[in-house]
């Protein structure tokens, strides 16, 4: 401070006042300062942020300020998921085959500004791409168009008020118990899961995985981290999980905004009640897009390679709970929630689950529940076709083993897309219900 005061012929106290904002330099002094430190006079007078940028230029010799891409989470970097984007776009029917090699070449680049720029170009290509002429599916994302392509299915039953509370309680407890069954090994692949289960006498699976099961194997031989996981014999209550968090968040949305909440209300609640780290894949992208100013439906579309992944399908249970026997109302709410982060089949999965749960409140017939859920998604969609493949296979006598083999053949669990896409997860859910034949334990295992 003394050196600065001497440099510009003022007192130390004057410099202190300039720093704390109680007084400001005369114009002649500002001109001297701008010349001495190579900072524009405009930036000194008008814009502190501009001054900071120019100081960076002077001090570090940089023409621009760039992020440290190594600090950027995978889900927040569009170019990091460029192969997922390719698979997603192809399945959507976009005519991008001529760019295939470019997608794969970009995926091999290290994280950085160059890869980001290539990703920006890819997004432009995707946005402007046309549908392939032979693409057989019609998959809208607006509620009106979805309804126009849905096939009605009315089971003709009324609410049994004596059983309703038990039904809804069972739905929530069942969700929690099923979630805990999988949480111990969430993310493990079958090539490691099956040997683990066999080693503990739990194959075919018929009970929870215990810490004692893990202690009996050499965990270091597994790629999957078996050590730092919750197990049924080491917990006191259900650990937090995004699957169940979203059910509570949906309840909060209804409490705050009522039954007529909007897609924008959902995003407002997301920002208000949970930090960014609580959201994954499509939800993380939508959250970040909203913070940047993108509102629904753009929040679901802009640089979102996860737009048909399972996130929306796990969020909409609550809308089924609060609309017992009214699957259309449940599906409508699910659409409002899902459309902030997903399109097409990603939305359909959410509507299917909400409608099916609404029907489950008044029926015990598994097939009726499934078909009622399907009545609220386009019959011209991949989702409808995939789920009906499971339903028809079951009715035609295909074994449970063959059913799951067919799902694995169509969707590769060893890719992020195959693992997390809405459709295979819906197929697995439907198969588990059908082949479980009303036995809850058999279905979740």
Residue ranges and their predicted role:
Residues 1-17:
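Short alpha-helical DNA-recognition segment
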Residues 60-136:
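Long, charge-dense tracts
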Residues 28-43:
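DNA major-groove recognition helix of helix-turn-helix/homeodomain DNA-binding modules
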Residues 187-224:
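Active-site-surrounding "flap" and adjacent substrate/cofactor-binding loops of secreted or lumenal enzymes
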Residues 149-161, 284-310, 316-346, 350-445:
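Accessory "access/gating" subregions that flank catalytic or transport cores
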Residues 47-59, 63:
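Short, charged recognition helix plus adjacent turn
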Residues 11-14, 26, 40:
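Short coil turns linking two alpha-helices in DNA-binding domains
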